[in-house]
Amino acid sequence: MARYIGPKCKLSRREGTDLQLKSGVKPFDVKTKKANKAPGQHGQARGGKQSEYSLQLREKQKVRRIYGVLERQFSNYYKEAARVKGATGENLLKLLESRLDNVVYRMGFGSTRAEARQLVSHRSITLNGRRVNIASIQVKSGDVIAVHEGAKQQLRIKNAIELAAQRGIPAWIEVDHSKLEGTFKAAPDRSDLPAEINESLIVELYSK
């Protein structure tokens, strides 16, 4: 399954919520005037009762799109989350949040996860002093992530840091923006993660 490269707001409208796919801190309804309409020429205002399966599938698609993960990757993350000790849904979110591209985004080096993923693929990011280009690397407690010396003057990184200052840096990450360097202190607790995600629906979907 190929990665989606079309209009970002269309995906957010499809899920009925802001997936944080576009840079900026404006509310979703300000980013797009069609916020409460499904995409398509004949998109109608949202309404009507959805089936249980439809709700579960939509939640999975929403989370998959938030983190920019393909279907097979997402399925593998779920299997790993179910294998280890703890609540499967919470484990799944921790695995997604621990991806290198997500951590780069959370540290404020990329204005979106897609931009953070591009920084990694272009070898503009170092992990514990070594340049890497695999966005899906699982970052561990104590790992140090930094912008490579050759990329520190990129305007998009400076712009991303300004946006991050408005958005806020999570407590489970420590960042020194003057050095363009940060430390992944620990995987986040569920209380640190987005409340609008209902991971129990995803667990119900995969449990069938």
From Swiss-Prot:
PROSITE patterns: RIBOSOMAL_S4 (PS00632), S4 (PS50889). This is Small ribosomal subunit protein uS4. Belongs to the universal ribosomal protein uS4 family. GO terms for molecular function: rRNA binding; structural constituent of ribosome. SUPFAM superfamilies: Alpha-L RNA-binding motif. CDD domains: S4. Keywords: Ribonucleoprotein, Ribosomal protein, RNA-binding, rRNA-binding. One of the primary rRNA binding proteins, it binds directly to 16S rRNA where it nucleates assembly of the body of the 30S subunit. With S5 and S12 plays an important role in translational accuracy. InterPro entries: Ribosomal_uS4, Ribosomal_uS4_bac-type, Ribosomal_uS4_CS, Ribosomal_uS4_N, S4_RNA-bd, S4_RNA-bd_sf. Residues 24-52 are annotated as: Disordered.
